């Protein structure tokens, strides 16, 4: 609650005074004049008889990046505080983060500034703390964040828009509000003068706030929030946008990395592979050893030449653009948060792809980059390199229209092309309207396929309902891929943690895989397996395998559309060090986890005395027509939870290099036994592929060996055979 004697604690109380200030700032010419006007404004609001105070953070709210919950009137006393009301799906909120990062780089809590993110969810999925934590990691948010799941602060302060910034003085008194994105100059002006004003009065405290970043406790991970994935149908490769590591991976179908380009830190540099950098790349498309990348947070389209091993920029200028028409040469054309890319042709008479279609999430439009001369529907001939809007007015809407420039999208985030008749369209995952839409390649007409509702202004028609057309419900879908073999569209229904399938002929939308729960389990079927905000997907060249970027699980999952099974796609370095798996170079410091679907076998008890050696012989059989994945470290390791003395504090482990010559595992019972009974766990991870390497899997099994420790010396103990057929 607000402190006693406070005035009405909502933003309307600030409006008259701040509006007068902003009109005055329009007429100010010099920086000195602007500084003076803000200083005078602060004298005015600071002299009000009653402060316009924010309420205290309610008890019981969940916090991230802090050692303990924060109090406005205890911890933040003596600070200039910026409350950032945001929701992590919102592209405008994402656009604001670089401004906040820059402000934090300029002023620290020792200078008297603290930013607090107040997460006020739009979608139900965004109310879950683990999902917010993943977003905090994805977007490198390093200030405290509170999960206001019930939007209590939002409602009490009468916030109406994402994002909204509220700047507080050192008494919790509201000073300014900024609504929407694009106010960097005002944000810095208001903050710097507020710090000066209150420092002049001795009201700023230099105490540190207990910050504890979750990212500091993350274990190393080969993939970090992979966003998008595509198949190179010519060279038997996959291209993965390893978004959280700010890099692009090119991997063979067995999972071996061929190229790692960029990372691990964000940057914006062209040049040779070892020097180039990206910033949260998303969409990828490959053709003839050329990869195009939606370099999202750099607001660029990048080109990777695998033969020359060079990265260059083909669209964007490196800062967020506001132009909603375009038409300039690509590297001179400002663009805004491109999220996905896909190749296409400017007409049926064109023999090869000459257009790169772009889901321009930042301006809620579909754009085109001309890779060669050509024309768009209802356009004159365009020069090579031209980058321009194709569909979408730029208004954030769910508006369908026969005229592409009058249609409206809401953060389009996924694209797929069906060039053949009768479809001849782009499929669009329009995330904020929770719909899938189509854009005609003949005339640009934008039509509804599934999800959402008829009111173009209602962006809150979401849910998880299988159905036809408007009766189907999605929740923030981020990816689509067209299955030409079956004439079906697969959808990454991200916030429902599902993969759905749409028949565009009937508009029927049904669940293909996932339970709706955010977790990481490989089940016995599609609907027993789980995902966590899958962000992208692509279909393999023969239509058998569906690759899914399971973003918050930091994995690529593979759905076999014929056998209806799910597996994890292994990713490993060419020097035989596994990157995506439990068996890393050297002995692991912590126990890797078996897949939840891994079967468990309890063995018959074995009696042994101190000093005796037990032997376990692996006898594993692979499915017919498969082989161990070359270069991937299939392995075993031992554990004894609750009886670590049995292993003398170690985690014995080893590799499985051949199915025909499997290892024997030896364990000597220590001389000093702390228990007469124990259970030894033998965990096994196997990476194997089909003979043609078209599908690769990681499987696991757990053998549990009960042990009875006795003082009586046992006769020679026969080896225990560990048999299993995968």
UniProtKB/Swiss-Prot annotation:
It comes from the Eukaryota. CDD domains: NHL-2_like, TlpA_like_DipZ_like. The keyword Cytoplasm applies. Keywords: Cytoplasm, Repeat. GO terms for cellular component: cytosol. NHL repeats lie at residues 212-254, 265-307, 335-369, 409-439, 461-505, 518-562. It is found in: Cytoplasm, Cytosol. InterPro entries: 6-blade_b-propeller_TolB-like, LDLR_classB_rpt, NHL2_NHL_rpt_dom, NHL_repeat, Thioredoxin-like_fold, Thioredoxin-like_sf. Gene3D superfamilies: Glutaredoxin, TolB, C-terminal domain. It holds the Pfam family NHL. The keyword Aminoacyl-tRNA synthetase does not apply. Disulfide bonds: none annotated. Monomer. Required for normal embryonic development. This is NHL repeat-containing protein 2. It comes from Bos taurus (Bovine). The lineage of its organism: Eukaryota, Metazoa, Chordata, Craniata, Vertebrata.
């Amino acid at each position: 609650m607000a402190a006693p004697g406070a005035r009405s604690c909502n933003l309307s109380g600030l409006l008259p005074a701040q509006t007068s200030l902003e009109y005055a700032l329009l007429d100010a010419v010099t920086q000195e004049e602007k500084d003076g006007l803000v200083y005078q404004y602060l004298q005015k609001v600071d002299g009000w008889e009653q402060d316009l105070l924010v309420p205290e953070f309610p008890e019981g709210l969940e916090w991230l990046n802090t050692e303990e919950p924060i109090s406005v009137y205890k911890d933040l006393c003596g600070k200039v505080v910026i409350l950032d009301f945001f929701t992590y799906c919102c592209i405008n909120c994402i656009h604001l983060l670089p401004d906040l990062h820059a402000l934090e780089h300029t002023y620290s809590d020792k200078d008297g500034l603290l930013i607090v993110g107040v997460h006020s969810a739009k979608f139900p999925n965004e109310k879950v703390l683990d999902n917010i934590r993943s977003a905090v990691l994805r977007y490198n948010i390093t200030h405290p964040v509170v999960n206001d799941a019930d939007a209590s602060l939002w409602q009490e302060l009468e916030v109406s828009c994402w994002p909204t910034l509220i700047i507080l003085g050192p008494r919790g008194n509201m000073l300014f509000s900024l609504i929407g994105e694009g106010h960097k100059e005002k944000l810095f002006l208001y903050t710097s003068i507020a710090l000066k004003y209150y420092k002049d009065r001795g009201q700023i405290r230099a105490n540190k706030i207990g910050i504890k970043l979750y990212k500091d406790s993350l274990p190393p991970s080969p993939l970090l929030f992979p966003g998008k994935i595509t198949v190179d149908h010519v060279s038997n490769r996959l291209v993965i946008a390893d978004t959280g590591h700010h890099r692009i991976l090119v991997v063979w179908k067995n999972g071996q990395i061929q190229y790692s380009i960029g990372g691990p830190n964000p940057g914006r540099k062209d040049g040779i592979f070892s020097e180039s950098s990206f910033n949260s790349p998303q969409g990828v498309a490959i053709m003839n050893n050329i990869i195009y990348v939606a370099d999202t947070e750099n607001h660029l389209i990048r080109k990777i030449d695998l033969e020359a091993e060079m990265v260059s920029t083909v669209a964007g200028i490196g800062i967020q653009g506001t132009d909603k028409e375009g038409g300039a040469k690509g590297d001179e054309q400002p663009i805004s948060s491109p999220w996905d890319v896909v190749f296409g042709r400017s007409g049926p008479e064109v023999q090869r792809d000459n257009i790169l279609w772009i889901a321009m999430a930042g301006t809620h439009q579909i754009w085109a980059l001309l890779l060669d001369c050509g024309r768009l529907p209802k356009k004159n001939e365009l020069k090579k390199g031209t980058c321009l809007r194709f569909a979408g007015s730029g208004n954030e809407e769910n508006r369908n229209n026969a005229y592409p420039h009058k249609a409206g999208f809401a953060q389009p985030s996924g694209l797929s092309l069906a060039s053949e008749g009768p479809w001849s369209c782009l499929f669009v995952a329009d995330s904020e309207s929770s719909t899938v839409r189509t854009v005609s390649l003949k005339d640009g007409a934008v039509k509804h396929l599934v999800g959402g509702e008829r009111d173009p202004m209602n962006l809150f028609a979401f849910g998880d309902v299988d159905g036809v057309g408007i009766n189907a419900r999605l929740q923030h879908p981020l990816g689509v891929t067209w299955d030409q073999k079956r004439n079906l569209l697969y959808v990454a229904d991200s916030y429902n943690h599902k993969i759905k399938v749409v028949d565009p002929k009937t508009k029927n939308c049904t669940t293909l895989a996932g339970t709706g729960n955010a977790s990481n389990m490989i089940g016995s079927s599609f609907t027993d397996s789980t995902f966590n905000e899958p962000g992208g997907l692509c279909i393999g060249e023969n239509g058998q395998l569906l690759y899914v970027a399971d973003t918050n699980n930091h994995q690529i999952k593979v759905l076999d559309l014929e056998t209806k099974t799910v597996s994890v796609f292994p990713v490993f370095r060419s020097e035989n060090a596994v990157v995506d798996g439990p068996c890393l170079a050297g002995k692991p410091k912590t126990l890797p986890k078996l897949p939840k679907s891994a079967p468990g076998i309890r063995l018959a008890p074995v009696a042994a005395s101190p000093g005796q050696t037990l032997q376990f012989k692996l006898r594993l059989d692979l499915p017919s027509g498969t082989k161990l994945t070359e270069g991937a470290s299939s392995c075993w390791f031992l554990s004894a939870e609750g009886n670590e003395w049995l292993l003398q504090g170690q985690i014995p482990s080893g590799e499985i290099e051949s199915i025909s010559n499997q290892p024997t595992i030896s364990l000597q019972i220590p001389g000093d036994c702390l228990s007469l009974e124990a259970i030894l766990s033998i965990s096994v991870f196997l990476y194997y592929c089909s003979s043609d390497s078209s599908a690769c899997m990681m499987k696991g099994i757990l053998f549990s060996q009960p042990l009875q420790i006795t003082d009586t010396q046992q006769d020679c103990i026969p080896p225990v055979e560990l048999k299993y057929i995968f």
